[in-house]
């Protein structure tokens, strides 16, 4: 049996590894000639860390995951802690530590684990067709590839998703812009083992430790889509949006490199009622494009891969296996997308009354409520 995997990002490579472990040959195709990850880093929470270990890639997490031991929310003006707490209870309950990791490092290490020579780059899909014998995809260079099944892990702009769904869903603008990048850890910004978030005015500024003595940082600002802003205006834009914010925020704006800082308009897509059509399955962002507000986008793709591998260990009947994959994943990924959307709206001031109430909750937070919510999300994954 042979699978075609479209996409060599986190989801596609996880899927290829999972299928190979289940005894299925995989050919992996990637649209671009060189993968340049969107975003500087990614939060891999314990459900994702467990998936990586299950797939044989646990060493990547241990080596490149940042030392995240505490969380704190800080007042945007004073910079004083609204709440601060240890993540030890989360680690104890979930059985794994969270591992924030540079996207470039994660992508590189996963690609090396699978084998760079085992990915065909510069292969952008145009269409697919299925018949009784299998499924065929065509690429923009005029070539084609055939297999017994097809895993569409080609991202939030998936070219194969309309074929699976029977319609072309529209991406929904979540209402805010995110700037992100990496800076050297500086205790004047935040403790080096803590996820620190400054909140106020429906905006936030976050710092999270990754490997090699660096912070992953991001700024969120509710804004209309399509503003004419770029790297040339980046520092001035952030200085304007965060005028009057605490000294560490000003120091971060001064320290960042505009040329390596990403500006992303955040979108999601309404959850789908299906992930499979015939021999073709959606996986990762192609199947559940989410906002990053609960840090579960990458983890969900890893979960997809683990479930995909498991169903093919149970049966070699493609229809039955993919039907079971869909049954196990549809509700889970819908829940994650909608949880992230709800968190997004509260964080970014869609209704400022609710956002102000959240700020007040943070001032009374011991950590227990936040950790309970995170554990609920994490432990609902396929590996518990």
UniProtKB/Swiss-Prot annotation:
Residues annotated as site: Involved in substrate activation for the transfer of oxygen from the flavin hydroperoxide: 204
Catalysis: reaction(s): urate + NADH + O2 + H(+) = 5-hydroxyisourate + NAD(+) + H2O
Inactivation phenotype: Mutants show impaired utilization of both hypoxanthine and uric acid as nitrogen sources.
UniProt-listed GO biological process terms: purine nucleobase metabolic process; urate catabolic process
Pathway noted in the entry: Purine metabolism; urate degradation
Residues the record lists as binding FAD: 11, 30-31, 43, 125, 285, 295-299
Binding site for substrate: 178, 204, 216-218
Swiss-Prot/TrEMBL cofactor(s): FAD
Disulfide bonds: none
UniProt xrefs under InterPro entries: FAD-bd (IPR002938), FAD-dep_Monooxygenase_BioMet (IPR050493), FAD/NAD-bd_sf (IPR036188), HpxO (IPR047712)
Keywords linked to the UniProt accession: FAD, Flavoprotein, Monooxygenase, NAD, Oxidoreductase, Purine metabolism
GO MF, any single term: urate oxidase activity
Pfam family, one: FAD_binding_3
The enzyme's E.C. designation: 1.14.13.113
Keyword presence, Glycosyltransferase: no
Entry function: Catalyzes the hydroxylation of uric acid to 5-hydroxyisourate.
NCBIfam families, per database record: urate_HpxO (NF033623)
Family indicated by similarity: Belongs to the FAD-dependent urate hydroxylase family.
Name of this chain's protein: FAD-dependent urate hydroxylase
Phylogenetic classification of the source organism: Bacteria, Pseudomonadati, Pseudomonadota, Gammaproteobacteria, Enterobacterales
